[in-house]
């Protein structure tokens, strides 16, 4: 999410159709370049949410994990709004 997207969201502005189309095309290209199946990407999202939720209280409804491409580089981007930190220590793994 760019700064402009954040400002537009805060002000309640709707994105222009050209901007929306460009964002969708970038998403399709990112998915294509990553060679990840939709099922694998969904599994990754669930697991990322589970791991982060061990340390902080996150808003799962507002959270998002996506692939973004910029300058021919594809990145996995997690946008997970925190509600509050979890004060107890995370469970130890075996």
From Swiss-Prot:
Record's keyword terms, sorted: Cell cycle, Cell division
Protein name: Cell division topological specificity factor
Classification via Pfam families: MinE (PF03776)
One annotated GO biological process: cell division
Gene3D superfamilies attached to this UniProt entry: Cell division topological specificity factor MinE
SUPFAM superfamilies the UniProt entry points to: Cell division protein MinE topological specificity domain
Role description: Prevents the cell division inhibition by proteins MinC and MinD at internal division sites while permitting inhibition at polar sites. This ensures cell division at the proper site by restricting the formation of a division septum at the midpoint of the long axis of the cell.
Gene that produces this protein: minE
Family, per entry: Belongs to the MinE family.
Residues in coiled coil: none
Annotated source species: Synechococcus sp. (strain CC9311)
């Amino acid at each position: 999410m760019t700064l402009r997207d954040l400002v537009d969201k805060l002000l309640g502005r709707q994105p222009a159709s050209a901007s929306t189309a460009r964002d969708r095309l970038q998403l399709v290209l990112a998915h294509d370049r990553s060679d990840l199946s939709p099922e694998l990407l969904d599994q990754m999202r669930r697991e990322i949410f589970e791991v982060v939720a061990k340390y902080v209280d996150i808003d799962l409804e507002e959270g998002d994990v996506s692939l973004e491409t910029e300058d021919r580089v594809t990145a996995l981007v997690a946008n997970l709004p925190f509600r509050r930190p979890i004060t107890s220590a995370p469970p130890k793994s075996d």
